[in-house]
């Protein structure tokens, strides 16, 4: 499984000169939490809802509402975006992306091919992909088989039983034994 199989292709983007207030509006209107920042076709960074919250003034500020609105209306994405985000290619194995995301606590990856942004892989994309891969929305029975030795002969036995009952396997997953 590769990232190309689960990423959001041609994601909504902004350029580095976009006003923060406009980026907030784009995120809200499209129900998204991240925006890649692209200038002249090249990825410059990424801005998240969290970045926008961090850039917002504290409620304890001594500035007036008008002063706050003025400051926010002038702030640009390039001032608060994360520059040079960790990226993936469309051919990155799904499992590797999952490992990197967990190890580095990253919730999304811009996907770049030949220097161009071609997609974004987010936590939501991963959940959607796993839901499809595991057949969660498909009708049928779920069977859990525990205690297998992990040998090919065990899998052959399972497939033989499934075939005897003229059943279709939509998905199969193997988990390591708990220590």
Write out the residue ranges for each language-model feature.
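Tandem CBS (Bateman) regulatory domains
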Residues: 1-10, 49-86, 93-102, 122-163, ...
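The feature marks the first
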Residues: 3, 12-30, 36-37
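Short acidic-hydrophobic, aromatic-tinged amphipathic segments that line or gate anion-handling sites
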Residues: 14-15, 87-89
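Short acidic/polar active-site loop segments enriched in Thr and Asp
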Residues: 33, 107, 168
């Amino acid at each position: 499984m590769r990232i190309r199989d689960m990423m959001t292709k041609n994601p909504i983007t902004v350029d580095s000169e976009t006003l923060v207030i406009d980026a907030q509006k784009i995120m809200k209107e499209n129900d998204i939490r991240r925006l890649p920042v692209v200038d002249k076709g090249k990825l410059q960074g990424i801005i998240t809802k969290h970045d926008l919250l961090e850039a917002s003034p504290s409620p304890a500020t001594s500035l007036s509402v008008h002063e706050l609105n003025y400051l926010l209306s002038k702030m640009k994405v390039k001032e608060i975006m994360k520059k040079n985000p960790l990226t993936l290619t469309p051919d990155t194995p799904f499992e590797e992306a999952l490992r990197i995301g967990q190890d580095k606590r990253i919730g999304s990856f811009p996907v770049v091919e030949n220097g161009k942004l071609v997609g974004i892989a987010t936590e939501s994309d991963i959940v959607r992909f796993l839901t499809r891969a595991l057949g969660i929305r498909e009708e049928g029975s779920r069977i859990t088989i525990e205690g297998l030795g992990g040998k090919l002969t065990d899998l052959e036995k399972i497939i033989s039983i499934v075939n005897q009952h003229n059943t279709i396997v939509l998905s199969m997953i193997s988990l390591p034994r708990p220590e």
